[in-house]
Amino acid sequence: MADLNAIVDQLSSLTVLEAAELVKQLESKWGVSAAAVAVAAGPAAAAAPVEEKTEFTVVLANAGANKINVIKEIRAITGLGLKEAKDLVEGAPKNVKEGVNKDDAKKIKDQLTAAGATVDIK
């Protein structure tokens, strides 16, 4: 260990020019280069897993021919009054429910489709 400490002390006492000359001599003696080695890029990071959507919006696209049944279903689903439900149905496309889970969105779509409406889930 004493030899290593002596080498460290000698290297520490070198000037910048002497250290540069030492590097050149070591490169030629060992057949290496002190240039930074370019690190090859690793494989591309795996694409982030696609998060499954947890909140859905049920959109009434078209009320269809049976508006009265669709209005009744809209009232049952949303709790809106008769006028508000009628305005929603006649103003299609409109959001019926927002921020519902997948099962509820599917159930609402099935109810409205059974009443004659065209429904989208977004």
Curated annotation (Swiss-Prot):
GO MF, any single term: structural constituent of ribosome
InterPro entries assigned to the protein according to its UniProt record, in alphabetical order: Ribosomal_bL12, Ribosomal_bL12_C, Ribosomal_bL12_C/ClpS-like, Ribosomal_bL12_oligo, Ribosomal_bL12_oligo_N_sf
UniProt keyword annotations, A-Z: Ribonucleoprotein, Ribosomal protein
UniProt cross-references to Pfam families, sorted A to Z: Ribosomal_L12, Ribosomal_L12_N
One CC-aspect GO term: cytosolic large ribosomal subunit
Annotated SUPFAM superfamilies: ClpS-like, Ribosomal protein L7/12, oligomerisation (N-terminal) domain
Record bears the keyword tRNA processing: no
CDD domains xref list: Ribosomal_L7_L12
GO biological process, one term: translation
Protein family membership: Belongs to the bacterial ribosomal protein bL12 family.
Annotated PANTHER family: 39S RIBOSOMAL PROTEIN L12, LARGE RIBOSOMAL SUBUNIT PROTEIN BL12M
Role: Forms part of the ribosomal stalk which helps the ribosome interact with GTP-bound translation factors. Is thus essential for accurate translation.
Quaternary structure note: Homodimer. Part of the ribosomal stalk of the 50S ribosomal subunit. Forms a multimeric L10(L12)X complex, where L10 forms an elongated spine to which 2 to 4 L12 dimers bind in a sequential fashion. Binds GTP-bound translation factors.
Protein's recorded name: Large ribosomal subunit protein bL12
